[in-house]
A protein has these predicted regions:
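Generic beta-strand/beta-sheet core signal
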Residues: 30-32, 60, 128, 133-136
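Extended, well-ordered alpha-helical scaffold/bundle regions in very large, multi-domain proteins
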Residues: 46-97, 101
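Conserved small/polar residues in nucleotide/adenosyl-binding loops
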Residues: 149-151
């Protein structure tokens, strides 16, 4: 589903005249929970297929995706075993690893890493590679900032 949606977003943007470097002028992706988080690496992958280099693809996607958190319960934030994702979406794992490397290069706090303890933390990917992060209420946003991303 995520791949189909990402392909449609790119096709519609191109049909409207986007060169994809300006994708944020043509599309916004609202990630309303952690299960659609895979749109981030999938959009990056598709942009790379179109000839856009990884760093620029990451920058483009970071201007297109925004994340809303609907809960403050840690157990509701999806975490997927690397071993599962390597089988289910092997084409996305190198991208997820690169995103994690970028986070590790700029953030010392291990609790915010995308890959930790053999798991891929979807909310962390959304937070680090989206242009906006918010909760459904001001209190949710503040708790999210303090407990998950430590700002």
């Amino acid at each position: 589903m995520v791949s189909n949606a990402a392909r449609l977003i790119l096709a519609e943007a191109e049909a409207k005249g986007s060169n994809l470097h300006d994708l944020a002028d043509y599309a916004a992706v609202q990630i309303n929970d952690t299960h659609p988080s895979m749109v981030i690496p999938e959009l990056i992958r598709l942009l790379q297929e179109k000839g856009i280099l990884m760093d620029e693809a990451i920058e483009i996607v970071s201007k297109v995706c925004a994340y809303t958190n609907h809960t403050i319960l840690a157990e509701a934030l999806e975490k997927w075993p690397i071993s599962f994702l390597e089988k289910a979406v092997p084409q996305l794992m190198p991208i997820i690893r690169e995103l994690d490397n970028k986070v590790r290069a700029k953030v010392a706090d291990e609790s915010t890493y995308i890959i930790k303890d053999g798991l891929v933390h979807m909310a962390h990917m959304d937070i680090h590679f989206g242009y906006s992060v918010n909760g459904v209420a001001y209190l949710h946003t503040e708790i999210l900032k303090l407990s998950l991303i430590h700002i």
